[in-house]
Amino acid sequence: MAIMFATEVSIPLRESEQAIRLPAGVLELTEEDLFEFCRSNRELRIERSAKGDIIVMPPAGGYSGFQSGEAFSQLKIWARQDGRGVAFDSSTGFRLPNGAMRSPDATWVELSRLKKLSHQEKEQFIPLCPDFVIEVASPSDDVSGLHEKMKEYVECGLHLGWLILPATTQVEVYTVEGVETLSSPVTITGDPVLPGFRLELASIWKPPF
């Protein structure tokens, strides 16, 4: 697998590798260029930091893919039944107020905020910070980097964020009040930001395969 550029240059990327960071200036990408770059590399998860660095993350392994998918699936089912907002998976990019572009494992945005966006804004990276995000750490992730990313979300307007750490069966809860660490929770609730949402963690801690 390789990262593809418009000039047909490619960078090999193996599934076991950590993310590749391309410092700002290596790739001079406009918003439109970045969107097309991501479309040309759909199999990869690509983000941009507030400083302009491009971060390319390898495909998830089996366990990590299941764990993040399980978190999104539960959020999606609840959001559809609740009707007050929309859930998005990691294929959706969000352009944050600080200039970063992030694609959390699972997100929820209040419907009224989305309805204010133009058709073009909805077609490309969504220009707002989600109300709620879930990030699930994989073995290749830099956990300290995930901590910084969660803090970035809060600084950009996030109301509630969960960083799920399967390796230690912990969940870090991020709000404007600070960070709370939960050890081996069986469930976690989204109240009051997502009233009624409950994430069941048993299958995330121990996948059924």
Positions of PLM-derived features:
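Gly/Pro/Ser/Thr-rich low-complexity, intrinsically disordered segments predominantly at protein N-termini
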Residues: 1-209
